[in-house]
């Protein structure tokens, strides 16, 4: 049967016998998030954006990216650390990293408890900053 509306997908999902009713809302949100990411090509767009930033920034310029889920965050973290979204570090003949970026700090900046209380949507946000070498 064709799924025309999101409610139809939710109904199909709820009929599955292994779905935990306590986790139903979170799991269903993840299904819709995965569909949105795939349909909108969000990961491809992010990868393209990151690669273009290297060309757009001058040496010493800073790149700041806010991510909202782990797939985005992993891609941004890898890019800022290695210069590649897959995390594979390229090295020169002397074994030195040839990454065009250097992360500022090893951990992302996350919202405070007070900010999350005022703005619940911020709870999953992570800010990462890097400098172009």
Model-found features: residue ranges?
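S-adenosyl-L-methionine-dependent methyltransferase catalytic core, i.e., the SAM/SAH-binding region
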Residues: 1, 6-133
